[in-house]
């Protein structure tokens, strides 16, 4: 059987800061394998359990929980210690009452927050692609790697409130003037803002969003924001 490309481990000094790992422990740490989120924007499930939320103390304990199907991401058991957990993913563990959602916070790319059990079956996903396939149907791609064939009218940059793991779209949140957005990357990561204007991209400039943070305004690429509601966030993100 061919070996999956890529190393199973990573030097601790090279790991992203948002993983929350100690730099003075053993030399290597579990890394992310190709999956729903890109390597630089996700946390390996084993690292998440041991270092981020500290529910276990050793890699062996993390492996036991994961291999025995005790860890669910978006309602599906994930049995790989290399599975990448990323933006807006909902994580629950068998026998533990706390449920976590990963969001940007205080300039950090990803941090877990505890959410109510009533929210574990819903997730916000950002539309990253639209493709017309056979018979005129539309395939929609989302930021977490999932895709869906649907007649729902959406545009790239919009967000969808999705039922998981069924992958049913409950509501569409368009990226438009007046939308409430969450900055997902950069120095303003984790901050909520109101969209004042959407500026279409040009040959040399990407699509941009003019955002209001109350007493200040900034203009950033629309790729760095995610719609989370109209006036207020429709799910818990803090």
Where are these regions (language model features)?
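Ferredoxin-like alpha/beta domains used as RNA- or RNAP-binding modules
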Residues: 1-238
